[in-house]
């Protein structure tokens, strides 16, 4: 049933905040675990094996927690991708049941690390009822992720896992370490050596499809144990011909001829000898005879000769050598003298009295 306190936008915002907070915590805890490995190597070098084992348990706890955070980050991302189903449907979609129940179950266990996770769980409980939230917190509904529950459990890590952590740390830092022979002898057969479980299903572990083998046999999914691969078909042997028998083409495969006549075989060709090369080389014509024949054949051709292409008009050639210049007068050496009747000044030619008289006459007429 639809809860009254559900707010879709608040759920969306807090889902994004949870993803960002989880990414930061994963990075921080991974860096701290790398530094702690150096301290464990120092303990092993100093001979403090028991102290190193206790520190390894802390590292395993942190690695478990980082893996659990990665699972929660994946579920938050899934809810954001399918947020339309949460808004539109009143009932819980079957594809979101594991994500919703796992987030509600993990909220009280990680709310000290991620405070926004509690808000997400409260909004989901308001959406799908408080009774559903109680069932998820106790896992009575049975949809909480088992792998996440194992990573966040309070049980101590296996002793064989602690020893293998110590072996790998000593190998990386070149520190001599002798593992506990009692613990190594009690290790069950087939225990995984790595901490992070990649989550293989039973079908893959029992012989599912290979991972990029490149040419090997791929067993079908869900095949029973002990299934033997089907052998590859072998090519049929070809009959070897006898060295003395003549070559013959094989009979054509397919329906028989419509005429009903038997199909014959091609027989080998009889022994045909190549022609003999003559003892004396053949005579050839000389070069002079060939040239004479060409001249005769060209003389026998009768007909109008093809006209030559018209040449473009050529530009007239200027003959600068035959050009005659006219005879010019010589340059005078002295300045010309003024004539006797010419006036030397322009002011002497103007009669001002005559001009004033004529001006007065004009004034009187007007």
Swiss-Prot record:
Keyword flag Metal-binding: no
Compositionally biased tracts (Low complexity): 337-347
Annotated GO MF terms: MIT domain binding; protein domain specific binding; protein-containing complex binding
PTM-bearing positions, type Phosphotyrosine: 43
Subcellular location: Cytoplasmic vesicle; Cytoplasm, Cytoskeleton, Microtubule organizing center, Centrosome; Midbody; Nucleus envelope
Keywords linked to the UniProt accession: Cell cycle, Cell division, Cytoplasm, Cytoplasmic vesicle, Cytoskeleton, Nucleus, Phosphoprotein
GO cellular component: centrosome; chromatin; cytoplasmic vesicle; cytosol; endoplasmic reticulum-Golgi intermediate compartment; Flemming body; midbody; nuclear envelope
Family: Belongs to the IST1 family.
Subunit details: Interacts with CHMP1A, CHMP1B, VPS4A and VTA1. Interacts with SPAST, STAMBP, and USP8. May interact with VPS37B. May associate with the ESCRT-I complex. Interacts with MITD1, in competition with VSP4. Interacts with SPART (via MIT domain); leading to the recruitment of SPART to midbodies. Interacts with SPAST.
Full protein name: IST1 homolog
Organism the protein comes from: Rattus norvegicus
